[in-house]
Amino acid sequence: PLPPMDVQKKIVEECEKIDKAVAEDNEQIRNIEVTISKMMLEVEGDAQKIQKLCSAINPSKSDVNSLEKSMLVSFVEMSSVSNDGYIEQTVDKPLADVRKRSYTYFAEGDIIIAKITPCMENGKCALATGLKNGIGFGSSEFHVFRANAKLINNVYLFAYLNRKEIRSKAAEVMTGSSGHRRVPISFYEDLEIPVPSMDKQMLIAEKYKGLMKDIESLKQQIANASSRKQAILDKYLK
């Protein structure tokens, strides 16, 4: 049976408040994304190719040859990388289980970016942090960038690459058959980006991290909307 009309009205009113809050959260996210885009577009500095700013691009697995085979490392599936710029989940695996296979190797502080469609266009990329023993392996469909800390801040580099503008340019140069198109590493190697002073880079990096944290909080609030509505129903109907 339907609840009394006054109860129905209260349920609708409270649920509409949640819908309004979700709409406001989405608007805030869009505004923050515009702020980030504008911040990166306004960066001034000498233009330099990424290959000159990295100590390694798609680093060799030989880096870990001397490590114990039984040592646990982080394994990252493509599905475990969000479209929002972070790793959502890792699985600890022995180094021996992942080193000899076709998985991509990376380390703490490296940048991983999906190279295959549609993952790249969707924004699957991350700054690899919190890796088990500082080592990660993952999908063969990642490109990996290791910033030269003397030349560029890794968060600044990630902030510059994790943008729709860069993804649009990357999509234009994809090669391969439909459904298996990939961004060639040469696109990133030859990509020129502005490199301000290290102090300026660090300021931008800190601001970027703060803005991304704000986006993450807002998205969490949006994700909780359904459970909040269910709580309203439970309050009035149980």
Enumerate the predicted regions with their spans.
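Generic alpha-helical structural context detector
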Residues: 41, 55, 114, 158-162, ...
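Sequence-specific dsDNA recognition surfaces
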Residues: 51-65, 76-111
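A short glycine-rich beta-alpha junction/loop motif
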Residues: 1-6, 135-143, 175-202
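Non-catalytic DNA-recognition/assembly elements of restriction-modification systems
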Residues: 2-65, 194-205, 209-238
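Short amphipathic beta-strand starts and helix->beta connectors
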Residues: 128-130, 173-177
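Short Gly/aromatic-enriched secondary-structure transition segments
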Residues: 69-71, 128
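Periplasmic-binding protein-like
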Residues: 166-169
